[in-house]
């Protein structure tokens, strides 16, 4: 299991969704969670460093989750950062686009705590965390 001190950044323009994800992470033992309301806000925080995992929505103002993902993957300092997309975008082409852009995983809203835990564990296992 991953280090419980792992620092998460939860990115979503909907504050209730950020709170839901934060609370689910807390239930899983991860208390080091910060929030960003869009991709621009997230990038500013990520560039300051210290994050070990990003959970991002797709549809957001200013910079959407897919653009954020592509920017993270193109940045040498952040390119290996795990990014889990959590989004209402359930179409096959969206899932393929996220995978091609380098998403570590993909969860469609609405989802359960068990689904989030399963996806996180798969990513942790794949990355040897």
Swiss-Prot record:
Stretches assigned to the Response regulatory domain: 7-124
PROSITE patterns: RESPONSE_REGULATORY
GO molecular function, one term: acetyltransferase activity
Effect recorded for residue 12 to A: Abolishes magnesium binding
Residue numbers bearing the 4-aspartylphosphate modification: 57
Keyword Chaperone in annotation: no
Binding site for Mg(2+): 12-13, 57, 59
GO biological process, one term: internal peptidyl-lysine acetylation
Name of a matching Pfam family: Response_reg
Compartment(s): Cytoplasm
Modified residues (N6-acetyllysine): 92, 109
Gene Ontology CC annotation, any one: bacterial-type flagellum
Cofactor note: Binds 1 Mg(2+) ion per subunit.
Predominant location category: cytoplasm
Keywords assigned: Acetylation, Chemotaxis, Cytoplasm, Flagellar rotation, Magnesium, Metal-binding, Phosphoprotein, Two-component regulatory system
PTM entry text: Phosphorylated by CheA or acetylated by acetyl-CoA synthetase, depending on which acetate metabolism pathway is available. The major acetylation site seems to be Lys-92. Dephosphorylated (inactivated) by CheZ.
Co-factor(s): Mg(2+)
InterPro entries: CheY-like_superfamily, Sig_transdc_resp-reg_receiver, ST_Response_Regulator
Role, per record: Involved in the transmission of sensory signals from the chemoreceptors to the flagellar motors. In its active (phosphorylated or acetylated) form, CheY exhibits enhanced binding to a switch component, FliM, at the flagellar motor which induces a change from counterclockwise to clockwise flagellar rotation. Overexpression of CheY in association with MotA and MotB improves motility of a ycgR disruption, suggesting there is an interaction (direct or indirect) between the c-di-GMP-binding flagellar brake protein and the flagellar stator.
Quaternary structure and partners: Interacts (phosphorylated CheY) with CheZ (via C-terminus).
Matches recorded under NCBIfam families: PRK10610.1
Protein name: Chemotaxis protein CheY
The organism of origin for this protein: Escherichia coli (strain K12)
Source organism phylogeny: Bacteria, Pseudomonadati, Pseudomonadota, Gammaproteobacteria, Enterobacterales
Gene name for this UniProt entry: cheY
């Amino acid at each position: 299991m991953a280090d419980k001190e792992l620092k998460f950044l939860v990115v979503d323009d909907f504050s209730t969704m950020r709170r839901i994800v934060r609370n689910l992470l807390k239930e899983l033992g991860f208390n080091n969670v910060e929030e960003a309301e869009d991709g621009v806000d997230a990038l500013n925080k990520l560039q300051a460093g210290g994050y070990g995992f990003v959970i991002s929505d797709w549809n957001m103002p200013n910079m959407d989750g897919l653009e954020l993902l592509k920017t993270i993957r193109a940045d040498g300092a952040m390119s290996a950062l795990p990014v889990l997309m959590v989004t209402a975008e359930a179409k096959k082409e969206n899932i393929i686009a996220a995978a091609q852009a380098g998403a570590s995983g993909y969860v469609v809203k609405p989802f359960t705590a068990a689904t989030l835990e399963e996806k996180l564990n798969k990513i942790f296992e794949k990355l040897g965390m």
